[in-house]
C-alpha cells in the first residue's frame, strides 16, 4: 500500500472553512474545499490524527480508487479490480454507502448492491466462504461517490460519524450535533477566551452539548478519545502500533488538561426534565469537575464566576416549536437581551438562531454574523460584545417618575413610550408623545365636580401607588352615583368602563354625563385623549363576558410586583389583569418558593407568573379558553419563564376529577357563571362551590394552602365546607386602597385541611 493517501473529510454544510483550517493544522496537505467536504493528502499518522482530533468532521474517507464510469458494468468491474484481500478477510462483514446518480445509476440502493456484489465476488473462496453484510457494525464500511461520470471509492476510517462522541446518550427535542456545537464555539472565540482563563455560561443549555464541547476544548481533550470502535479496527491496512502511539499522546494531553484548575463553565435550563440527562452527559464525558448544570429561567439568568472573571455567554434559543407562537419567542429573545445587558456587562455573547429577525429584538448590536446550517435549516451565529455602546434600547421610566410627572402636569422630553404589540407579537410603532400639558376643555358644572373628584383621588392614591411601586390601579369607582364609571390607570393609559344605567334613568341624561366625564378625564389625569379607552359594562351571561369588543389585537406591557404582564385595553371587556386581585397575586408570589402551584380558572395566568417569580418549583394553570392560555404563554415568555410552567386547556371540574398530582399552593378564582360548547353542563359558583372545593382539596398536599375567591356579590359560602376544612375569610387582607371604596369587589378565603 501507498505511504500517502487521498482523504475526503465530510462535514455539515457551512463548516467547510473551519474544517480546512483544522485539518491543515492536524497535518493535511494540498487541502481543497468542496461542498460539505475537504479534500487533501496525508500519511497514515495524519489520517489517524484527524479521526482522533477533528472536532468538526463527520467522516474521514480514505480514497482507494478513482475510475471513469459510464454504466453499471463499469461500476462493477471498477470495484472488482481492487485487491480486496489487502483490506478485509473473506469471512468479514461490510456495509456499502452509495451517493450520487447518473451513468445508468438512478437508484442509490442499486448502486450499493453492485458495489457489494463486486467485493463479494472478489473475495469468495473456492469453499464458498464470502463476506456478509452488517449495516450497523461492519468490519469495513465502504463508500462510493459518483461525481460527473467519475466513481470515487473510499474506505470510511471513522466508522460511525465522528460527531457521535459517546457522551450524549440522552438528548432534548432539538439538539445540536456535537460537531456543529464545536464549530459555533470556535467561531465564537472560545479557544481564545479559554486560553485566557475566561468563563462560559449557557442560559438555555438543554442537555449540555455546548458545555461539554467547550470543556473538551479548554482541557485539550481529543473529541473521540473514548471511542472504542473505529472503521479501521478490522481493516488489514491498520497499523495498531502507530494508532496506540497517537492515542497514548492524546490521553496524556487530556490528563494534563484535566489536572489544571477547572474553568468556570455553567449551564442553566428551565425544563426540569432535562437537568438530570444533562448532568449524566457531563458525567459520561468525565467533566463533572468542570461543568455544573442548574435549573434556572432565562428571566433570572445571572452568571457569577468564582473570581468575577468575564467570558462567553453562548446559547441556542428556540426558533421553532419549542415555545409555541411567534409572540412567545419574541418575548424570550427580548428577555435574553435584557439579561445580557443587565447581568453580563463586558462579556462576549454568541447567539445561534434560525430566526435572525428575532435576534434583532434583543436590543444589542452584533458586531459579526456567520452563516451556518442546522440540518436543512439556515441559521445565523450572532456575535455580540456586551458593552453599553452596543445597546439599542432606551431606558423605561419608573413608576415614581411617571407619578411625579402626573402630579406636576409635565412629561419628560425624552420619555420612552410604553411598549405595545399586535396580536402576532410584533411591536407597533409608537405614536408621537403627547404634549406636556393637555389642552383645557370647557367643562359643565357637573363635569368640573367630576374632574375635581378625579384629581382628589389621584392625589391620594398616587402617593400610595408611588410608595408601593404600583403602576396600574383604580382611580375612580362610581364614587359619584351620577357618574357611574370605573376608571383604571395602566401606566400612561386610562381604561374607562361605563356601568349600564338602570332603566329608570333617562338615557339622554346618562349620555350627557358620560360626555361630561370623557371631557374631564384627560384634564384631570393629564393624559392625551387618544390614550383613553371607553367600554360599557353590563351584566354578563354565559360566554358573553369573554367575547371580543373589537379586534385591534394590541397588547401593552405593564409591570407589577417585579414582573411584566401584557394587557389588552381594547379587545375584551376585561384587560387580562384583574387589578382588584393584586394583593392576592403578591401573597402568592411571597408564599410560592419551592412549591407546586395550581391556578384554576387561570384566565391569563397572571397569578402563575407571580408564583414563578416567587420561586415556585412548578406551576400548572388550567382554563377552558385557548385564547387566554395563549395570552398566558406570552406572559410567561415575557418574563423568561418557560417549559416548567404547564398550561392546560380544559373544563376545570373535569380536569380536577381526572388529576392525580398533588399541589402545595392552589388558587381558585372562578367566574360567577360559565357555559361553553367545550364543557359539560353549566358552571354556577354558588351551586357548584362544594364540588369544586372538594375536588381541589383532594389535590392539596399535606400542609398545603388553598385560596378561594370570587366576585359574585350575593355569594354565600356553604356551611358544610366549614365542617370539612379549616376556613378563614381573608377578604379585608386582599383589598388594596384603590378598591377600598367597593367592599363587594370580591370575597376571599384561606382553606386548609383540618
Swiss-Prot record:
GO terms for MF: 23S rRNA (guanine(2445)-N(2))-methyltransferase activity; RNA binding; rRNA (guanine-N7-)-methyltransferase activity
UniProt keyword annotation of 4Fe-4S present: no
Domain of life: Bacteria
Record-listed E.C. numbers: 2.1.1.173, 2.1.1.264
Enzymatic reactions: guanosine(2445) in 23S rRNA + S-adenosyl-L-methionine = N(2)-methylguanosine(2445) in 23S rRNA + S-adenosyl-L-homocysteine + H(+); guanosine(2069) in 23S rRNA + S-adenosyl-L-methionine = N(2)-methylguanosine(2069) in 23S rRNA + S-adenosyl-L-homocysteine + H(+)
Listed GO CC annotations: cytoplasm
InterPro entries xrefs: 23SrRNA_methyltr_KL, DNA_methylase_N6_adenine_CS, RlmKL-like_Mtase, RlmL_1st, SAM-dep_methyl-trfase, SAM-dependent_MTases_sf, THUMP_dom
Location of the THUMP domain: 46-157
Pfam families: Methyltrans_SAM, RlmL_1st, THUMP, UPF0020
SMART domains: THUMP (SM00981)
Gene3D superfamilies the UniProt entry points to: 3.30.2130.30, RNA methyltransferase domain (HRMD) like, Vaccinia Virus protein VP39
Compartments reported by the entry: Cytoplasm
Alphabetic keyword roster: Cytoplasm, Methyltransferase, RNA-binding, rRNA processing, S-adenosyl-L-methionine, Transferase
Function recorded in the entry: Specifically methylates the guanine in position 2445 (m2G2445) and the guanine in position 2069 (m7G2069) of 23S rRNA.
Family as reported in the entry's similarity comment: Belongs to the methyltransferase superfamily. RlmKL family.
Name of the protein in question: Ribosomal RNA large subunit methyltransferase K/L
Lineage: Bacteria, Pseudomonadati, Pseudomonadota, Gammaproteobacteria, Pseudomonadales
Gene: rlmL
Amino acid at each position: 500500500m501507498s505511504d500517502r493517501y487521498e482523504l475526503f473529510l465530510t462535514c455539515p454544510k457551512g463548516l467547510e472553512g473551519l474544517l480546512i483550517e483544522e485539518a491543515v493544522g492536524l497535518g493535511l496537505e494540498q487541502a481543497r474545499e468542496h461542498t460539505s467536504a475537504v479534500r487533501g493528502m496525508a500519511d497514515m499518522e495524519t489520517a489517524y490524527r484527524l479521526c482522533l482530533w477533528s472536532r468538526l468532521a463527520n467522516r474521514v474517507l480514505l480514497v482507494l480508487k478513482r475510475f471513469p464510469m459510464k454504466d453499471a458494468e463499469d461500476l462493477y468491474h471498477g470495484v472488482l479490480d481492487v485487491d480486496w484481500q489487502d483490506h478485509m478477510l473473506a469471512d468479514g462483514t461490510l456495509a456499502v454507502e452509495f451517493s450520487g446518480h447518473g451513468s445508468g445509476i438512478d437508484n442509490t440502493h442499486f448502486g450499493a448492491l453492485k458495489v457489494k456484489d463486486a467485493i463479494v465476488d472478489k473475495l469468495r473462496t473456492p469453499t464458498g466462504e464470502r463476506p456478509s453484510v452488517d449495516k450497523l457494525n461492519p468490519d469495513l464500511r465502504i463508500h462510493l461517490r459518483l461525481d460527473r461520470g467519475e466513481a470515487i471509492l473510499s474506505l470510511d476510517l471513522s466508522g460511525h460519524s465522528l460527531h457521535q462522541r459517546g457522551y450524549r446518550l440522552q438528548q432534548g427535542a432539538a439538539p445540536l450535533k456535537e460537531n456543529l456545537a464545536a464549530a459555533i464555539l470556535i467561531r465564537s472565540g472560545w479557544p481564545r477566551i479559554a486560553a485566557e482563563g475566561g468563563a462560559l455560561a449557557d442560559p438555555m443549555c438543554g442537555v449540555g452539548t455546548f458545555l461539554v464541547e467547550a470543556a473538551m476544548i479548554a482541557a485539550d481533550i481529543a473529541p473521540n478519545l473514548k471511542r472504542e470502535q473505529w472503521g479501521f479496527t478490522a481493516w488489514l491496512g491498520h497499523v495498531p502500533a502507530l494508532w496506540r502511539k497517537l492515542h497514548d499522546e492524546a490521553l496524556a494531553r487530556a490528563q494534563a488538561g484535566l489536572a489544571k484548575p477547572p474553568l468556570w463553565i455553567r449551564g442553566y435550563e428551565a425544563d426540569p426534565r432535562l437537568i438530570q440527562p444533562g448532568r449524566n452527559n457531563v458525567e459520561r464525558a468525565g467533566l463533572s469537575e468542570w461543568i455544573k448544570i442548574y435549573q434556572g429561567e432565562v428571566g433570572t439568568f445571572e452568571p457569577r464566576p468564582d473570581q468575577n472573571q468575564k467570558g462567553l455567554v453562548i446559547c441556542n434559543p428556540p426558533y421553532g416549536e419549542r415555545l409555541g407562537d411567534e409572540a412567545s419567542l419574541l418575548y424570550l429573545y427580548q428577555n435574553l437581551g435584557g439579561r445580557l445587558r443587565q447581568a453580563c456587562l463586558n462579556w462576549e455573547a454568541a447567539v445561534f438562531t434560525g430566526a435572525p429577525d428575532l435576534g434583532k429584538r434583543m436590543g444589542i448590536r452584533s458586531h459579526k454574523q456567520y452563516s451556518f446550517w442546522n440540518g436543512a435549516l439556515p441559521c445565523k451565529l450572532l456575535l455580540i460584545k456586551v458593552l453599553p455602546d452596543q445597546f439599542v434600547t432606551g431606558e423605561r421610566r419608573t413608576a415614581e417618575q411617571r407619578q411625579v410627572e402626573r402630579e406636576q402636569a409635565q412629561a419628560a422630553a425624552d420619555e420612552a413610550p410604553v411598549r405595545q404589540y399586535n396580536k402576532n407579537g410584533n411591536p407597533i410603532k409608537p405614536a408621537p408623545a403627547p404634549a406636556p400639558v393637555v389642552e383645557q376643555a370647557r367643562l359643565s358644572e357637573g363635569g368640573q365636580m367630576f374632574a375635581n373628584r378625579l384629581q382628589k383621588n389621584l392625589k391620594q392614591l398616587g402617593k400610595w401607588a408611588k410608595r408601593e411601586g404600583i403602576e396600574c390601579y383604580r382611580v375612580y369607582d362610581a364614587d359619584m352615583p351620577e357618574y357611574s364609571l370605573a376608571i383604571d390607570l395602566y401606566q400612561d393609559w386610562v381604561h374607562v368602563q361605563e356601568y349600564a344605567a338602570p332603566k329608570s334613568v333617562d338615557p339622554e341624561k346618562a349620555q350627557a354625563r358620560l360626555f361630561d366625564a370623557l371631557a374631564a378625564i384627560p384634564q384631570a389625569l393629564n393624559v392625551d385623549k387618544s390614550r383613553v379607552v371607553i367600554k360599557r359594562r353590563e351584566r354578563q351571561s354565559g360566554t358573553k363576558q369573554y367575547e371580543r369588543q373589537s379586534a385591534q389585537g394590541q397588547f401593552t406591557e405593564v409591570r407589577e410586583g417585579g414582573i411584566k404582564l401584557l394587557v389588552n385595553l381594547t379587545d375584551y371587556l376585561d384587560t387580562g389583569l384583574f387589578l382588584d386581585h393584586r394583593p392576592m397575586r403578591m401573597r402568592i408570589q411571597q408564599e410560592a418558593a419551592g412549591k407546586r402551584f395550581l391556578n384554576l380558572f387561570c384566565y391569563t395566568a397572571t397569578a402563575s407568573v407571580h408564583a414563578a417569580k416567587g420561586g415556585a418549583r412548578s406551576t400548572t394553570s388550567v382554563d377552558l379558553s385557548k385564547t387566554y392560555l395563549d395570552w398566558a404563554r406570552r406572559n410567561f415568555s415575557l418574563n423568561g419563564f418557560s417549559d416548567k410552567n404547564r398550561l392546560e386547556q380544559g373544563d376545570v371540574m373535569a380536569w380536577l376529577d381526572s388529576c392525580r398530582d398533588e399541589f402545595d399552593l392552589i388558587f381558585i378564582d372562578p367566574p360567577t357563571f360559565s357555559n361553553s360548547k367545550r364543557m359539560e353542563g353549566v358552571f354556577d359558583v354558588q351551586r357548584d362551590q362544594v364540588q369544586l372545593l372538594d375536588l381541589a382539596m383532594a389535590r392539596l398536599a399535606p400542609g398545603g394552602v388553598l385560596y378561594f375567591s370570587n366576585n359574585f356579590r350575593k355569594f354565600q359560602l356553604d356551611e358544610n365546607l366549614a365542617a370539612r376544612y379549616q376556613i378563614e375569610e381573608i377578604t379585608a387582607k386582599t383589598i388594596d386602597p384603590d378598591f377600598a371604596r367597593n367592599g363587594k369587589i370580591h370575597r376571599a378565603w384561606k382553606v386548609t385541611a383540618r
